[in-house]
């Protein structure tokens, strides 16, 4: 996970049930600046080509249809009905084309940018949203009017508010939820009195910004109703518990004070690691064992097992995490939350024995989509006392039928 992970780490630690944590997202982006491509595709009507100047996506559809089935990939029907081909499948075509040696992938901007208005829109799009992309093009002499910029696929992201559905297993709204998916208050987690929204809530993809703040409003109203119903009465936190939490939170700073004079060179210390060292270690671990960008998003049960073992060893080392100031203390806790999130992601990826989202990740030992056994939601719970995970399947209910 490349976000701070705190929305997930706090809940996992508390023993909340989580869902769809294997459903990470990989995004097609302009290379190095990571500017989004959607506005260019939709507004400027640009399109992609391989390094030879060829259309490449369609050549991968037959292979992909073998993997996922015609129900999920039917280019002819998509053309007739304007139903878009899923993002992950388009990613797969891009990844496969590069791995076949016909990269890089280019966004064809030279045609659209001949129109002065569209050229202005193209630049303003990034100057208003992803300034780094516009600056990078200027700094590297890339003019989209005269040169088609390169695209790439991103590292995996774990989030519940964009196109994927990672997050907590929450109660749905009373009016549309099946009985077992509603337990009194909309967006309440499986922990009594704990509510979530946006990234924190699982199984609700495509919320984006507007959906997230709308969900936040729904969640806040439900939490107020919970309080009005008297459910929050009698909650007492003792001074002893408060002091225990303070000690836990400030432990990295205390550890630094004790061992700060034992640095042998640079940041090397035999008695602690700092947040940056831990972050680099976690990134490398997840990238290599849980289907990261450098391995073309490929993993398998053996790799995931090794990853879980290394995460366990890292958890022991996080006991010696040090923070020199409040900023590093923030980074230290972000790292611990990322680590817990990474563990949950790895557990879920191992549990789902299929490749449900080719282009987001691949289970090399189970490369096909398997609706017979895995058209389900995955649900986990980490026991706060033992650290052990319990995994289960939950049914998917199609509340909106095809064609509605």
Positions of the model-derived regions?
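Glycine-rich loop(s) and the adjacent beta-strand/alpha-helix scaffold that form part
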Residues: 1-36, 209-222
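Predominant activation on well-ordered alpha-helical scaffold segments within soluble catalytic domains
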Residues: 5-12, 167, 198, 213-224, ...
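Short C-terminal domain-edge/linker segments immediately following a structured domain
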Residues: 9-16, 50-53, 224-230
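Mobile, glycine/GP-rich and aromatic-enriched active-site lid/loop segments adjacent to catalytic centers
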Residues: 22-206, 288-404
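Catalytic phosphate/nucleotide-handling subdomain of diverse soluble enzymes
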Residues: 185, 189-253
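Long, amphipathic alpha-helical stalk/connector segments used for oligomerization, subunit docking
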Residues: 228-324
């Amino acid at each position: 996970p490349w976000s701070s992970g705190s929305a997930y780490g706090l809940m996992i630690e508390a023993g909340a049930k989580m869902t769809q944590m294997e459903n990470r997202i990989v995004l097609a982006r302009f290379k190095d600046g990571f500017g989004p491509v959607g506005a260019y595709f939709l507004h400027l009507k640009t399109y992609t080509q391989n390094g030879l100047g060829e259309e490449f996506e369609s050549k991968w559809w037959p292979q992909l249809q073998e993997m996922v089935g015609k129900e999920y990939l039917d280019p002819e029907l998509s053309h007739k009905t304007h139903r878009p081909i899923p993002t992950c499948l388009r990613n797969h075509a891009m990844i496969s084309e590069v791995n076949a040696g016909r990269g890089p992938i280019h966004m064809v901007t030279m045609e659209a940018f001949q129109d002065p208005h569209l050229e202005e829109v193209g630049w303003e799009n990034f100057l208003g949203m992803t300034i780094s992309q516009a600056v990078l093009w200027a700094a590297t002499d890339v003019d989209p009017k005269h040169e088609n910029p390169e695209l790439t696929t991103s590292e995996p992201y774990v989030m519940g508010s964009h196109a994927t559905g990672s997050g907590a297993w929450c109660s749905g709204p009373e009016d549309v939820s099946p009985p077992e998916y509603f337990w009194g208050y909309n967006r309440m987690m499986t922990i009594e009195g704990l509510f979530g929204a946006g990234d924190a809530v699982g199984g609700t993809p495509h919320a984006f910004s507007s959906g997230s703040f709308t969900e936040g409003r729904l969640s806040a109203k439900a939490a107020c109703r919970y309080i009005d119903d008297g459910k929050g009465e009698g909650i007492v936190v003792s001074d002893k518990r408060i002091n225990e939490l303070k000690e836990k939170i400030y432990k990295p700073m205390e550890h630094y004070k004790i061992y700060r004079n034992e640095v042998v060179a640079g940041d090397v210390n035999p008695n602690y690691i700092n947040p940056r060292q831990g972050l680099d270690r976690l990134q490398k671990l997840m990238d290599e064992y849980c289907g990261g960008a450098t391995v073309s998003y490929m993993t398998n049960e053996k790799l995931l097992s090794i990853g879980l073992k290394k995460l366990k060893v890292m958890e022991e080392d996080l006991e010696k995490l040090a923070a020199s100031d409040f900023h590093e203390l923030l980074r230290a806790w972000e790292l611990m939350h990322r680590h817990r999130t990474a563990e949950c992601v790895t557990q879920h990826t191992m549990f789902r024995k299929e490749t449900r989202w080719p282009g987001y990740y691949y289970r090399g030992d189970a490369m096909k989509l398997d609706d017979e056994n895995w058209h389900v939601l995955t649900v986990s719970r980490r026991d706060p006392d033992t650290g052990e995970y319990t995994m289960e399947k939950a049914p998917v209910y199609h509340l909106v039928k095809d064609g509605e």
